[in-house]
């Protein structure tokens, strides 16, 4: 199954939500799994993005659906990258 890198910035509403309910991070991960994603790794980061997640989805359409769902909530702005294993990439050259 394809892997994706999900780069997340919290909006001001998102910051308030996390501050008032830190468990919301785990809740969102469970919700992403219900949409069809599997969260493999997730880091809170300092800098341009607030969270970086490595997720797996059945296909790009499932990832797109999840991205729209997450973005529609108004608490995050997301950027999604398709992650190709380096061995697969090298083999395709």
Name each region found by the language model.
Residues 68-93:
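Glycine-rich beta-strand-turn "strand-cap" elements at beta-sheet edges
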Residues 5-9, 43-66:
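Short, well-ordered beta-strand segments in beta-rich or mixed alpha/beta enzyme
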Residues 37-39, 75-76:
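A short, amphipathic edge element
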Residues 1-33, 38, 45-49, 86-93:
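Short S/T/G/P-rich N-terminal loop/turn motif that feeds into the first structured element of a domain
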Residues 34, 59-61, 81, 91:
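Short alpha-helix boundary/capping motifs
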Residues 15, 53, 79:
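Short, flexible active-site loop motifs that bind/organize anionic cofactors or intermediates
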Residues 41-43, 80-81:
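Short beta-strand segments at enzyme active-site cores
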